[in-house]
Amino acid sequence: MTEGTVKRGDIFYADLSPVVGSEQGGTRPVLIVQNDTGNRHSPTVIAAAITSQTGKARLPTHINIAGGSVGLSKDSIILLEQIRTIDKRRLREHMGRLDEKQMHEVEDAIAVSFGLPGGNRGMQ
């Protein structure tokens, strides 16, 4: 992975191992949620794990992504409660990019995850 080529909204395969406990691990898709200034200048990125296990409990921090879109072969869920900082060297293949509408959904789910104003995806 070449530094400086990562953009907010990009989806990459990333190696998230090793993990502890309930963290998402292995080589899996991740969504880059860090701002582009950080993406350009930092050796790390902030990313959210993506799973194809669509039978998981539906949370207001989950965003559904249809298989066949943005480089994902299966229906998947972006897990905005599973956000972590990773070194860019963990990034592998670039898969695709979310559109503006999808990123607005992501931003709302992040607000829910972090308890920020505007997070209104079903949480009280």
Task: Go through each PLM region and give its residues.
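Conserved functional hotspots at enzyme active or ligand-binding sites that engage polyanionic ligands
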Residues: M1-Q124
